[in-house]
């Protein structure tokens, strides 16, 4: 099944002004003073241009957007391809070609094995697929979308509400990064049968990262002369 994740579509007959419905003001309740992985790195004296590790994940062709790409609507390449087997569900994001593997009716992995997009397990509650994810890699924290700590916990609910629509709901709990849990929802709309997910060949055309680092080394060399 191929779904588009960036449509502005009414939920229960209403066009929403925010994906967030709890808290009621529609805002993410960020905790003032919280330092995530990247902020701690900068506070220690490291610069974003010291090495590739300081650059954002999309610039390194690793991931794009939030801890789980389906959390935030994409501005481009917003397609999600959902593949289901008896024991697993795979959600492929077209942007940077992220493939998220979700195990059905399994236990979480040991906490000392952090995962890109978290360790995700799922179960069915009637016709709703409930996905619980923990143990995200700290590098996935993003000040532009979803900030996270080692306590970040995500619960998602996927409910088919028509032949062509999935109601997608999520709740984030992270007492270090946020003042309180927050929840959001939106509609995923099925694409036309002829639509396809295309390969996102990021590394092959990624000239920006070596250029950024080379420019930083050039400036350092000039300043030392």
Where are these regions (language model features)?
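PEST-like low-complexity, intrinsically disordered acidic/proline/serine-rich tracts
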Residues: 1-225
């Amino acid at each position: 099944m191929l779904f588009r994740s960036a449509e502005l579509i009414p939920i229960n007959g209403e066009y929403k002004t925010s994906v967030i419905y709890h808290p009621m003001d529609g805002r993410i309740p960020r905790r003032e003073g919280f330092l995530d992985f990247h902020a701690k790195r900068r506070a220690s004296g490291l610069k974003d241009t010291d090495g590739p590790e300081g650059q954002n994940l999309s610039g390194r062709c690793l991931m794009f957007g939030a801890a789980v790409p389906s959390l935030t609507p994409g501005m481009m390449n917003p397609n999600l391809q959902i593949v289901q087997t008896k024991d697993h569900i795979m959600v492929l994001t077209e942007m940077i070609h992220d493939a998220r593997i979700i195990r059905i009716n399994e236990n979480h992995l040991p906490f000392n094995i952090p995962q890109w997009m978290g360790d995700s397990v799922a179960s069915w509650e009637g016709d709703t697929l409930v996905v619980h994810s923990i143990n995200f890699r700290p590098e996935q924290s993003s000040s532009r979308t979803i900030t996270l700590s080692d306590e970040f916990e995500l619960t998602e609910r996927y409910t088919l509400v028509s032949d062509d629509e999935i109601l997608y709901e999520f709740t984030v709990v992270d007492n270090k990064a946020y003042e309180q849990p927050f929840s959001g929802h939106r509609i995923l709309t099925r694409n036309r049968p002829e639509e396809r997910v295309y390969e996102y060949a990021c590394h092959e055309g990624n000239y920006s990262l070596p250029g950024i680092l080379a420019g930083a080394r050039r400036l350092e060399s000039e300043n030392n002369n």
